[in-house]
Regions:
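Peripheral (often C-terminal) accessory segments that flank ATP-dependent C-N-forming ligase machineries
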Residues: 2, 168-256
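Active-site proximal loops enriched in glycine and acidic residues that flank catalytic Cys/His/Asp
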Residues: 141-144, 241
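ATP-dependent carboxylate/phosphate-activation module, predominantly the ATP-grasp catalytic core
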Residues: 52-58, 63-121, 125, 132, ...
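Structural signal for hydrophobic packing residues in well-ordered secondary-structure cores
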Residues: 40-43, 112, 116-120, 174, ...
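Residues at or immediately flanking beta-strands
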Residues: 47, 127-129
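Conserved protein kinase catalytic/activation segment
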Residues: 135-138
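Short, flexible turn/loop "capping" segments at secondary-structure junctions
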Residues: 14-17, 88-89, 227-233
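Active-site nucleotide/adenylate-binding loops and adjacent lid/helix of ATP-dependent enzymes
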Residues: 1-49, 54-56, 66-68, 95-110, ...
């Protein structure tokens, strides 16, 4: 392949990693070479993916399949770092359920079912990442596992026990699932910066009843450094926001 003929920008990432490790947008051949070496060093199978940059907002879908029948458990709205390091695609927060109108939700659901059938998924969990814009849905990737942090978000939002559902599938037991309206808006925020930590402290002081759980390593004297992936966070915390409460103030900085 002649890399000089590639159209930039592009996204480079390892084929088999998680938590955003090694994922970066590149704008020229020199950046591509550096990103390729880094992604290859992180990949367990040595395979590096080079993809086009997709427009639109990013969402992910959690599914469970049983004998080839698929259940769409939840759709997550994903938030990414903005500003100087936005090309690293670092996730800074997740929201369940995603804020979608009926048409958008239907489009995502239809594409999700198509991709599960295309890959002949019969049993277990899948985590599908996608972009949505005015032109429709574009699939980024599919993984045969549940997305990180989703079990708690799904529990907080809907009351579903997705771990129990997956266990029942593995034991060949019938899944009992009835789609219902969310009871809460469930958020997980990650702590990468001093501002993130201050936002956590503000939330804990002013709205302690909204924090369903937290795992925070940061302290007032913590020195924050550049983070390249979710494993570099200084912790995270879950929020259960009542449906009629304005949740914009609880979202990651820069999002409404």
């Amino acid at each position: 392949m002649n890399i000089n003929k590639l159209k930039f920008p592009l996204v480079v990432k390892p084929s088999d990693r998680s938590a955003g490790r090694g994922v970066v947008k590149v704008n020229n051949t020199e950046e591509l070479k550096i990103a390729y070496k880094n992604a290859k060093s992180l990949s367990n199978n040595g395979i590096v993916l080079v993809e086009e940059v997709l427009d639109g907002k990013q969402f992910s879908v959690e599914t469970i399949s049983e004998n080839g029948m698929h259940i769409i458990v939840a759709i997550t709205e994903e938030f990414f770092r903005q500003g100087k390091y936005e090309d690293d695609f670092l996730e800074v927060g997740h929201l369940i359920p995603a804020r979608l109108n009926d048409k958008e939700k239907s489009a995502i659901q239809k594409e999700t079912l198509k991709i599960l059938d295309a890959f002949e998924i019969k049993f277990g969990a899948c985590h599908i990442e996608l972009k949505l814009d005015i032109n429709g849905v574009k699939i980024i990737e599919i993984a045969s596992r549940m997305g990180g942090w989703r079990n708690t978000l799904i529990r907080d939002a809907y009351g579903y026990n997705i771990n129990e559902m997956l266990l029942n599938v593995s034991l060949n037991k019938k899944i009992k699932f009835k789609e219902q309206k969310n009871k809460f808006n469930a958020i997980v925020n990650f702590i990468f910066t001093k501002d993130d930590f201050e936002h956590y402290k503000w939330t804990r002081k002013k709205y302690p009843e909204f924090i369903s759980d937290d795992f925070v390593n940061a302290k007032d004297d913590t020195k924050f450094f550049y983070a390249s992936d979710l494993l570099c966070s200084n912790g995270f915390y879950y929020l259960k926001i009542p449906p009629r409460t304005d949740m914009k103030q609880f979202l990651p900085k820069g999002y409404k």
